[in-house]
UniProtKB/Swiss-Prot annotation:
GO molecular function: RNA binding; RNA endonuclease activity
Enzyme class: hydrolase
Name this protein carries in UniProt: Ribonuclease Y
Location(s) in or outside the cell: Cell membrane
EC number(s) per entry: 3.1.-.-
The species this protein was found in: Clostridium tetani (strain Massachusetts / E88)
Free-text function comment from the UniProt entry: Endoribonuclease that initiates mRNA decay.
Swiss-Prot/TrEMBL keywords: Cell membrane, Endonuclease, Hydrolase, Membrane, Nuclease, RNA-binding, Transmembrane, Transmembrane helix
Membrane spanning residue stretches: 28-48
Membrane topology summary: Single-pass membrane protein
Amino acid sequence: MTLSKLLYLSAIDYLNTKSKGGAHLNLTYYIVATIIIAVIAVYVDYYIRKNVSAAKISNAEEKGRNIIEDAKREAESKKKEAILEAKEEMHRLRNDFEKESKDRRNEIQRLERRIIQREEALDKKGDMLEKKEESLNKKHQELENKKSNIENLYEKQREELERLAGLTSDQAKEMLLEEVRKEIKHETAMLIKEVETKAKEEADKKAREITTYAIQRCAADHVAETTVYVVNLPNDEMKGRIIGREGRNIRTLETLTGVDLIIDDTPEAVILSAFDPVRREVARIALEKLIMDGRIHPARIEEMVEKAKKEVENNIREEGEQATFETSVHGLHSELIKLLGRLKYRTSYGQNVLKHSIEVSYLAGLMASELGMDPTLAKRAGLLHDIGKAVDHEVEGPHAIIGAEVAKRYHESSIVVNAIAAHHGDEEFESIEAILVQAADAISAARPGARRETLEAYIKRLEKLEEIANSYEGVEKSYAIQAGRELRIIVKPEVVDDAGSYEMARNMAKTIENELEYLVKLR
């Protein structure tokens, strides 16, 4: 609080006191006293402020002079330090420059010495090269002279040889070339024989390993199917009931099933004979149901035959599903599964086609695994390779082509379709899976006991083998042995030599392969 304010407040307090003590003072006196006090307070305040400001200004000026003096002294000190540092830096730079200059002079001198040494070495090499060139030129001239002498000598000897032999050089060359051609031809034939024999041995060894391993892991226990089936009867009296009055029961059963019922003197047995296994199976089931039921008459026979047909259809579907389950082949179309089931009632040379297809699927998958391939496609193609046999009595054409068309219709992959079509050579192989399926098919078919062959067909096959062998020029005699698995040929030595016999064997093998269908390897 300033002095004027204190005086003003003191005056107010004084007046208030006076007013309380003497109420008789008038208002004018109060106002005049207040103004006087206020003027005095303002003047005193102004005087005090002026003295205080002057003191502050004086102090500030003194501080400013001190600061300026300090700054001048500090600037002078900094200036001296900067001059000293600059002198030191100049001295250091001068030393560095002198050192670097000295190093560069030394390096230049070293390079100059190396250049001088290289120039001296190059001069020496140049002198040596000049000497070598002179020596080579001299030797070249000597060789040219010797070459000229040799050519002259060769010409004289050639003329002397032509005179003595009575042949020109061209005639002699032709004779020599002819001899060389014969020798090269013979050596080429022997080399081809050696290479091909070695390649066949290696291929046969590897193929035997793969097929042996596959066969060892795939043991089939089924036997050849027959075209007849024997139904056991509880007693011989049942034969008369099956025949019926005037033979109407047996005629009805034969008409509805298409199967021949043979009732002879065989005790307690009826023979069902039919080439269609599906019809034979329908007749068997129907007859067994009739025997169990005991009521045998045309109406009942018709009813049982219908039930048997439905049961066979169910069995066909179940057999197809079981085949896919056994071989782990999934995702087949329902129609393909049904066709697979129908193969159970088809045979090929007495071999059950469904069992054969399962066996081929196993073998193809195992061989694919041995080759480091994914066995899935090989097993799928092997299972479906004979699918055409389930429909080939309805559609004309080879069963391989029919099967390929069926597989294609039900969206099988191109690899599977080609494997089916090519497994009998009707189309070219487009994949390794197709080759494996053909090999597995041949293994399954050639397995001992898998298929039957009639005596007449066997004899004709042996005669055809010997006929093909005897048709070649130079063959004296031929023998088909080992059940037609080996063909031994005796040739005339004056007509066929060793190399020619090898070529004859190759051509004969191709002829047999083209003209005969073989399930085994022929030696």
